[in-house]
Amino acid sequence: PFYLDIGFSKEQIANIAAAFGLAMTLGGAALGGFMVARFGIAPILILTAFMAPATNLVFAWLAYIGPEPQGLVLAIIADNITGGLAISVFIAYLSSPSNTAYTATQYALFSSLMTLPGQFAAGFTGLLATQLGWIGFFCVTALTGLPAIILAFALLKLAHPDHVARPGID
């Protein structure tokens, strides 16, 4: 409802999302794989921890400027590149401590756990958006990314994914 509420037509949304959505997600995933291979998991995990809330600020900006097609293109590109990048880095991170004998099981468990907070919060987002308006909503959701940033830094101190022995490999 966000895009429609700020004045985009269904046709505009479909055309722009179709033109940029999947390609940017795949591009983000490929970029994430390249960056993890080049720089390691840790710095890219930190980068994506910052990028995800920043993407929400792009949506706040889009709500502010209104139905500008270039704004929608930028928001979709930013969101999908960030999503693709983040999921590829998160998969690399989840795979890093896994015992190779149980990688599929551990990945299934961890990736399912990853979706729980979002599923829980989804029930409240409509109410929050109604109460705060779209700009306030996206600013608040950007702030909810701060714990992830703090956790990413704490994770690096406790168990740096690029330096931890992998059971079954090391």
Predicted regions and their residues:
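Helix-to-loop junctions at the C-terminal end of transmembrane segments
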Residues: 27-44, 129-130
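Short amphipathic helix-loop junctions that connect adjacent transmembrane helices
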Residues: 1-17
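C-terminal ends and interior cores of transmembrane alpha-helices
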Residues: 50-67
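Transmembrane alpha-helical cores of Major Facilitator Superfamily
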Residues: 18-23, 50, 77, 108-116, ...
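Multi-pass alpha-helical transporter architecture, strongest
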Residues: 142-170
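A late C-terminal transmembrane helix in Major Facilitator Superfamily
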Residues: 97, 101-130
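A membrane-interface helix-boundary motif in multi-pass transporters
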Residues: 124-147
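Intracellular juxtamembrane helix-capping segments at the cytosolic ends
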Residues: 84-99
